[in-house]
Amino acid sequence: MESVSSRGGDPVVKPSMEVWHFQIAVYFAFGFFFLRLVLDRYVFQRIALWLLSTGSAPIKLNDAATRAKIVKCKESLWKLLYYAACDFFVLQVIYHEPWARDIKLYFHGWPNQELKLSIKLYYMCQCGFYVYGVAALLAWETRRKDFAVMMSHHVITIILLSYSYLTSFFRIGAIILALHDASDVFMETAKIFKYSEKEFGASVCFALFAVSWLLLRLIYFPFWIIRATSIELLDYLDMTSAEGTLMYYSFNTMLLMLLVFHIYWWYLICAMIVRLLKNRGKVGEDIRSDSEDDDD
């Protein structure tokens, strides 16, 4: 692909999106698989054992419940590392971009917006992670009661990522991804505190998670992001053509489906909040407990 330099010095990829670009996402997916294997064995296992051993009771490695908790702790360590790293990266990339703070600029210049190489790699990384995530849900991670919902979420996210990239909606796509990862950082941190029986840390992080979910996914996402795709986008699409109409309704339908998932999980979060208040600040079991009814 041909590239040029932007004023900020970051290479800019000309917006000639092609399907073969997603080979990079496939490479990322395989890379995540092998990286997870290495980290699980040599890093996360040791961290999980250390975290669980600092709890109130001595750790029993021959206990099935303890082994299950170690597996879940490693899952959360992996996800925390990924979400925190990705969010830090994309925030660094878009911090100085004027369109990051003005919804009227999300589509300004579309479809001939410049695609920085950093945003392209970020997109392919995220797409690869969710491709890996589908495989991990099927064959690796703890099977939880919301498996079908989570699988549907991952599939829709992959389709939305691919669609927004191929249609050059990558500005608003990067914002959406950053919003989602921010909440997940707090969620995985709260889980790690819970597994290590640090109730105060778990309660604080869960509260931050709930607030961030409400603000980012239930307020900012529908009233800023979906508003932009529903109203601002109309200034750039030819709604008299079949292509423009299909593009408009396809993109917004997928975003609304994500919002439905957000509302569903907010219901579960509210149930957790009720438990937390009843337990006087102690975070209870995750409503999304796994199929074997182990504590999450």
Curated annotation (Swiss-Prot):
Membrane-related topology note: Multi-pass membrane protein
InterPro entries found in the cross-reference section: Lag1/Lac1-like, TLC-dom
Keyword Membrane: yes
An example Gene Ontology biological process: sphingolipid metabolic process
Biological pathway: Sphingolipid metabolism
UniProt GO MF annotations: sphingosine N-acyltransferase activity
Null allele phenotype: Elevated levels of free trihydroxy sphingoid bases as well as ceramide and glucosylceramide species with C(20) to C(28) fatty acid, but reduced levels of species with C(16) fatty acids. Better resistance to submergence under light conditions, but increased sensitivity to dark submergence associated with declined levels of unsaturated very-long-chain (VLC) ceramide species (22:1, 24:1 and 26:1). Increased susceptibility to AAL-toxin triggering programmed cell death (PCD).
Keywords: Endoplasmic reticulum, Lipid biosynthesis, Lipid metabolism, Membrane, Phosphoprotein, Transferase, Transmembrane, Transmembrane helix
Protein name: Ceramide synthase LOH2
Biological source species: Arabidopsis thaliana (Mouse-ear cress)
